[in-house]
Amino acid sequence: CALPIFQADIGELLDLLCRDPELYVEVETNGSIDLSPQLKKPLRPSFTMDYKLSASGMEHHMFLPNLPLLTMQDTVKFVCGSQSDLERAWEITREYDLTHHTHVYLSPVFGAIQPADMVEFMKDHHMTGVTLQIQLHKVIWDPNKQGV
């Protein structure tokens, strides 16, 4: 079940889920929400924070104070739609030293930027510790197909 992180009482639900040692709890967030109340808890879920870059028109909503609080339990995913998005992702990764304290993924906006171009950028900038993530379902099936 997917629940938006900003729902009322979500913190209480996450606390209950994280107390169960048989459960692995991971929350994906769009990056605009302050995660510090959850990130500072000893028992907490893993977070995948999508960082929307300028091509999305949403970068101004990103909550940057989350970045230093993320750990190797978490992931930052930069959704890139242009060369300038790649450059910005690299800038943020270096500024916050992300690869030394959290997982970092680059993910292409399907059809907007070629994964091969992203790999070349990663090689040219020695982006070791950064993973390219492709939406495999859009490669395997028609990218407009629903329910896959």
Can you annotate each of these PLM segments?
Residues 5-148:
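Conserved AdoMet/S-adenosylmethionine-binding subsite of the radical SAM
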Residues 1-3:
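Short, small-residue-biased leader/transition segments that mark boundaries at the very start
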